[in-house]
């Protein structure tokens, strides 16, 4: 059976794209008198309308989703072109303040709450002390700029140790006494992780790989052998397990896909999820069902709205500071709550607190992203509902299915692989890239996957959009357009790496959630998307 899809492109009179016809679904592109994109629409499904200022910056974005919801987000800038104010669709707003060097030093909201403050930084420009609500957070780094500890009162106190290759060899929760030690093979792939508490061994885990294909052959928490390519299947596509793990329900899970290869439907027993995508092929609506219970989630930039079957509306606002996600403001059917967010070095959510640091919910994950009991790392998570569904590297957990939606693709943290292949071979010189179902080259503690299609080094290293961009420009002889950079050159990646370390801004936390309509998705993503997309398409971007 052919899997080819016919896509027709119709140019505008001035050489600009006018229409894209994908199997009868037409995406229309309109432009203003200055040839700026003014509207993208799929009739009856999704529309985006853009308003610009005199410097061609987007100041207003209006979205219509399925003719059911209309959202307007606005952005204003100061005289230096920095984002001064961001207004969410329901009128809630955040304000940014900067020092004389252009560093973000504070984020406040419509109610004058001090959400985030930058207090001090080291010589590299990495933030060492910040304040979230009324609580100070301290971060220390080793001589290479890698994180050695992150602490905040009685909320979190994490310690990290990296080897000379940059791989994490241990992490410790000094509040609970937990420690996890890691070992790697010659390809830097994780091979074992062992948990102890108060120096007493709790659990040992291991994983093995096929030496030819790089696929996982066994994983101790699964407990059975992985089979690939059976019945003329693809050599990297999982086709069987030699038994049924206890953590997998005795039900058939069915997944269907759109013609652009993103998950459309998931069903498991009485549970189901139906996703709708917008003009940018990012999810805009999800209908979640569990038996008779139903709720709908709409996604629009750094704002989400949940509507349950009784019509109650939960409005979720994600707010970024200078070192990633800083807070979440929730209006739950008129009841307002604000949470400060505390994340690990990869941007995974560890705790939600009130403004005074009182912990409301804690979270923990194994190296592959499985939820586990924060009070007992050897045990799996038993809770089924959380204040927010964001967690591992700030992606959206689909807890009813045991999956994580990583924007471009859906990931199974128990199996340690994606459900579908990566559309890109990111680094053709690295043979591990040809296992396109694999997660982060088998090195989940060094990389994150913000888009579900591209692995990035840990956020604290290459998170700085500005630093990485500057380094890439230098490496390519002053070429300012990242679409024209040589991504096959080690010099490009090396200079981007160095520039990001010097920049010291962990903006990859924002990148991790850009594709899903999360923090930084509306404004900073506009600045960063050219760099990001060029990186994972080898410079072949449509703009």
Predicted regions and their residues:
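Acidic/glycine-rich beta-solenoid
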Residues: 1-338, 358-359, 372-388
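A cytosolic small-molecule/anion-sensing beta-strand core signal
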Residues: 259, 345, 412-414
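Residue-level signature of beta-propeller blades and closely related beta-rich strand-turn architectures
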Residues: 64, 174, 396-398, 410
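Peri-catalytic substrate-binding/gating loops that frame the active-site cleft of hydrolases
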Residues: 112, 365, 420-426
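Extended, hydrophobic alpha-helical membrane-active domains that insert into or remodel lipid bilayers
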Residues: 451-543
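Short, low-complexity export/processing leader segments characterized by acidic and small residues
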Residues: 352, 370-375, 409-419, 423, ...
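A motif-centric feature for acidic-aromatic and gly/ser/thr-rich catalytic loops and repeats
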Residues: 228-230, 331-407, 436, 441, ...
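Short, cationic motifs built from Arg/Lys/His that form the positively charged side of catalytic pockets
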Residues: 189, 282-283, 407-409, 417
């Amino acid at each position: 059976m052919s899997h080819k899809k016919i896509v027709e492109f119709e140019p505008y009179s001035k050489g600009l794209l006018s229409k894209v016809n994908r199997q009868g679904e037409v995406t229309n592109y309109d432009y203003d008198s200055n040839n700026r994109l003014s509207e993208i629409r799929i009739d009856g499904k999704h529309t985006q309308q853009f308003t610009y200022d005199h410097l061609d910056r987007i100041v207003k974005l209006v979205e219509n989703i399925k003719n059911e919801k209309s959202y307007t987000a606005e952005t204003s800038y100061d005289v230096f072109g920095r984002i001064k104010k961001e207004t969410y669709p329901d009128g809630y707003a955040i304000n940014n303040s900067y020092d004389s060097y252009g560093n973000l030093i504070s984020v406040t909201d419509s109610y004058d709450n001090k959400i985030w403050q930058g207090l001090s930084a080291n010589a590299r420009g990495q933030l060492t002390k910040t304040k979230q609500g009324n609580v100070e957070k301290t971060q220390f780094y080793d001589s290479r700029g890698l994180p050695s500890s992150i602490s905040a009162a009685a909320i979190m106190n994490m310690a990290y140790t990296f080897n000379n290759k940059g791989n994490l060899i241990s992490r410790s929760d000094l509040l609970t006494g937990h420690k996890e030690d890691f070992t790697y093979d010659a390809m830097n792939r994780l091979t074992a992780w062992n948990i102890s508490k108060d120096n007493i061994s709790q659990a040992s885990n291991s994983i093995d790989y096929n030496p030819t294909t790089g696929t996982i052959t066994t994983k101790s928490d699964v407990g059975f052998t992985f089979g690939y390519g059976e019945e003329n299947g693809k050599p990297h596509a999982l086709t069987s397990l030699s038994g049924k793990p206890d953590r997998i329900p005795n039900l058939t899970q069915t997944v269907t896909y759109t013609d652009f290869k993103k998950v459309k439907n998931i069903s498991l027993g009485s549970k189901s999820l139906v996703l709708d995508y917008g003009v940018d092929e990012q999810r805009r609506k999800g209908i979640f069902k569990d038996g008779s219970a139903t709720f709908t989630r709409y996604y629009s930039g750094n704002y989400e709205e949940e509507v349950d079957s009784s019509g109650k509306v939960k409005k979720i606002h994600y707010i970024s500071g200078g070192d990633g996600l800083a807070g979440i403001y929730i209006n739950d059917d008129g009841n307002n709550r604000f949470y400060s967010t505390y994340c690990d070095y990869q941007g995974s959510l560890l705790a939600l607190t009130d403004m005074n640091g009182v912990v409301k919910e804690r979270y923990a994950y194994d190296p592959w992203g499985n939820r586990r009991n924060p009070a007992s790392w050897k045990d799996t998570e038993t809770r089924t509902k959380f204040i927010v569904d964001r967690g591992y590297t700030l992606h959206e957990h689909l807890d009813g299915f045991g999956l994580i939606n990583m924007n471009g693709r859906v990931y199974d943290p128990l199996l340690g692989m994606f459900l579908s292949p990566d559309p890109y071979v990111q680094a053709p010189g690295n043979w591990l890239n040809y296992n396109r179902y694999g997660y982060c080259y088998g090195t989940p503690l060094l990389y994150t996957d913000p888009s579900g299609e591209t692995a990035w080094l840990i956020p604290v290293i290459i998170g700085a959009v500005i630093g990485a961009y500057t380094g890439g420009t230098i490496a390519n002889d002053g070429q300012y357009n990242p679409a024209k950079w040589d991504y096959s050159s080690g010099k490009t990646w090396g200079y981007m790496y160095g520039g990001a370390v010097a920049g010291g801004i962990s903006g990859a936390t924002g990148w991790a959630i850009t594709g899903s309509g999360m923090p930084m998705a509306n404004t900073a993503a506009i600045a960063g998307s050219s760099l990001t997309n060029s990186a994972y398409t080898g410079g072949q971007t449509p703009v």
